[in-house]
Amino acid sequence: MTIAIGKSSKEPKDLFDTMDDWLRRDRFVFVGWSGLLLFPCAYFALGGWFTGTTFVTSWYTHGLASSYLEGCNFLTAAVSTPANSLAHSLLLLWGPEAQGDFTRWCQLGGLWTFIAFHGAFGLIGFMLRQFELARSVQLRPYNAIAFSAPIAVFVSVFLIYPLGQSGWFFAPSFGVAAIFRFILFFQGFHNWTLNPFHMMGVAGVLGAALLCAIHGATVENTLFEDGDGANTFRAFNPTQSEETYSMVTANRFWSQIFGVAFSNKRWLHFFMLFVPVTGLWMSAIGVVGLALNLRAYDFVSQEIRAAEDPEFETFYTKNILLNEGIRAWMAAQDQPHENLVFPEEVLPRGNAL
């Protein structure tokens, strides 16, 4: 028998290796290094939103009631943006505005910046989580790449747009009706629906919905009917190892319907990835443009002719007048600190009126 005497080749683990072993251990809910960013940020963002919508008023920032405590419901409650006078202050609890007073911090709109930044980093943490897991199980990172699209939209709408304006005040508040108000604001002040980047975003989202419906229906239509047992459709069995539907049949069907069809599964699924992700990224780029007050399409010749000819009006000129109406009515209500007053005679009226 040979006995080897000497130093063990197995060195003791350092702190990093110990943490790595624990964080990336196979468990029911994966934690990972990304979880150090994701879980705290998601917890604080959601907790801040539930706290704000339940208890915190918007009286001091918008002159509105916005909490369940004041009588709002799920659709009308919101965590509102800080007042316009606070510009782009981070509104830290210990900052010069609140000076450590939690009640004052909530009244000033501190919860909005708290939720916006923790929410943004939480979303980034979720994308990193997908990268980390994909690397662990040797998958391509397309899930994480796809998730970059909603992150781009969130960051552009909630952070970049108000940074381009005079303050966080002009970002969307975190609530259902508040988001609707923001959409009306975008239309009235930026003519957003006529912006080509918005058009690409709509095409991407609705096109993706159409592709999802067609793809799901086609797969269900071409499931193999295997055997004559009690469970006729073995394709619904999650342990079935063989292919569950016929790509050849699907290709033949759509070739007859449209004259063209996907003949390759990889190209088909890449297209389903490409359409919505590109659409959302285009929308995000468009919102960055709005942050800089870039204009959408302007058809000035139609506006001039409509102004000169009482009988000439197009859907475009009607929409321009609607936008003027939104600006006139919304500015006075939405920016009470400006003390704007518009007499009846200056409110826009179309030629049809």
From Swiss-Prot:
Modified residues (Phosphothreonine): 2
Swiss-Prot/TrEMBL keywords: Acetylation, Chlorophyll, Chloroplast, Chromophore, Electron transport, Iron, Magnesium, Membrane, Metal-binding, Oxidoreductase, Phosphoprotein, Photosynthesis, Photosystem II, Plastid, Thylakoid, Transmembrane, Transmembrane helix, Transport
Self-association and partners: PSII is composed of 1 copy each of membrane proteins PsbA, PsbB, PsbC, PsbD, PsbE, PsbF, PsbH, PsbI, PsbJ, PsbK, PsbL, PsbM, PsbT, PsbX, PsbY, PsbZ, Psb30/Ycf12, at least 3 peripheral proteins of the oxygen-evolving complex and a large number of cofactors. It forms dimeric complexes.
Enzyme Commission code(s) on record: 1.10.3.9
InterPro entries, A to Z: D1/D2, Photo_II_D1/D2_sf, Photo_RC_L/M, Photo_RC_L/M_CS, PSII_PsbD/D2
CDD domains xref list: Photosystem-II_D2
Catalyzed reaction equations: 2 a plastoquinone + 4 hnu + 2 H2O = 2 a plastoquinol + O2
Gene Ontology MF, one: electron transporter, transferring electrons within the cyclic electron transport pathway of photosynthesis activity
Family: Belongs to the reaction center PufL/M/PsbA/D family.
Nucleus as UniProt keyword: no
Binding sites annotated in the UniProt record for chlorophyll a PD2: 198
Residues the record lists as binding a plastoquinone: 215, 262
Chief location of this protein within or outside the cell: plastid
Pfam families in UniProt: Photo_RC
GO cellular component, one term: chloroplast thylakoid membrane
Residues binding chlorophyll a ChlzD2: 118
Mode of membrane association: Multi-pass membrane protein
Residues given in the record as pheophytin a binding sites: 130, 143
Organism from which the protein derives: Psilotum nudum
Binding site for Fe cation: 215, 269
Protein name as catalogued: Photosystem II D2 protein
Transmembrane segments: 41-61, 125-141, 153-166, 208-228, 279-295
Keyword Membrane annotated: yes
Modified sites of kind N-acetylthreonine: 2
PROSITE patterns named among the record's database cross-references: REACTION_CENTER
Cofactor: how bound: The D1/D2 heterodimer binds P680, chlorophylls that are the primary electron donor of PSII, and subsequent electron acceptors. It shares a non-heme iron and each subunit binds pheophytin, quinone, additional chlorophylls, carotenoids and lipids. There is also a Cl(-1) ion associated with D1 and D2, which is required for oxygen evolution. The PSII complex binds additional chlorophylls, carotenoids and specific lipids.
